[in-house]
UniProtKB/Swiss-Prot annotation:
Organism: Arabidopsis thaliana
Composition-biased stretches (Polar residues): 190-202
Highest taxon listed in the record's lineage: Eukaryota
Keywords carried by this UniProt record: Chloroplast, mRNA processing, Plastid, Transit peptide
Region of interest called Disordered, as start-end residue ranges on this chain: 190-232
Reported phenotype of the disruption mutant: White leaves with green islands, giving a variegated appearance. Mutant plants can grow autotrophically on soil.
Compositionally biased intervals (Basic and acidic residues): 205-224
UniProt name for this protein: Multiple organellar RNA editing factor 9, chloroplastic
Main location: plastid
GO biological process, one term: chloroplast RNA modification
Alphabetized GO MF terms: mRNA binding; protein dimerization activity; protein homodimerization activity
Length: 232
């Protein structure tokens, strides 16, 4: 398990933000703010595990006013332990054009080609990519060392290079759709299902909607005259 020291330096901020999984545990990191001053990169989504990953992938730098105040102070830095961070599992966040937006297959091909550029072959890329996403976030996860991770910087479409960490600590799961030697296994995070309303007690109160307009005229039966008696 790795330890990470927060800092106001924008070059170290991306590595300090890290994996995208523990914002629910740390609402604020020393020197890092999550609030209106951030420019959101990704949208929130419904699954709990992915929400944690998306939440911390927020922005590249803090606002300059806050950073300058931080750099001029002697505030002590905080060290945060993140389960799963070992500098051998990395999250590569990428961006894609919106118009026209690429298909899922095209995004996966881009992930593999980007990793192949770093590792030297498509075969190695397929061996080392272990997960990815094209929906809740746009990026892939791969097993490489820290020195190799530096080679992603400056490649087309690459936004951030972040050490990965568990989104499910109990099951040691890094999240995303699994990618095992070319085989894709979609993630199966539980989603919230609202309880269905019990309408049994309302069934007796159902009624039919009346037609618009005035009520139809009342129809009366003709009055029957009493039968005349025969005269004797």
């Amino acid at each position: 398990m790795a330890s990470f020291t927060t800092t106001s330096s924008s070059s170290l901020l991306l590595k300090t933000l890290l994996p995208v999984s523990h914002l629910n545990r740390f609402s604020t990191l020393s020197g890092i703010r999550v609030g209106d001053s951030w420019t959101p990169l990704l949208r929130n989504i419904s699954t709990a595990g992915s929400r944690r990953r998306v939440a911390i992938v927020k922005a590249a730098t803090v606002d300059s006013d806050y950073s300058s105040k931080r750099s001029n102070s002697n505030e002590q830095r905080e060290t945060i332990m993140l389960p799963g961070c070992d500098y051998n599992h990395w999250l590569i966040v990428m961006e894609f054009p919106k118009d026209p937006a690429p298909s899922r297959d095209q995004m996966i091909d881009t992930y593999l080609n980007t990793l192949a550029t770093v590792l030297g072959s498509m075969e190695e890329a397929k061996k080392n990519m272990y997960a990815f996403s094209t929906t809740t976030y746009t990026g892939f996860q791969c097993t490489i060392d820290e020195e190799t991770s530096e080679k992603f910087k400056g490649l087309p479409g690459v936004l951030w290079v972040l050490p990965d960490s568990y989104i499910d600590v109990k099951n040691k799961d890094y999240g995303g759709d699994k990618y095992i030697n070319g085989e894709i296994i979609p993630c199966t995070y539980p989603t919230y299902q609202p309880k269905q309303r019990n309408n049994t007690k309302y069934q007796s109160k159902r009624y039919e909607r009346k037609r618009d307009g005035p009520p139809p005229p009342e129809q009366r039966k003709p009055r029957q005259e009493p039968a005349a008696s025969d005269s004797s």
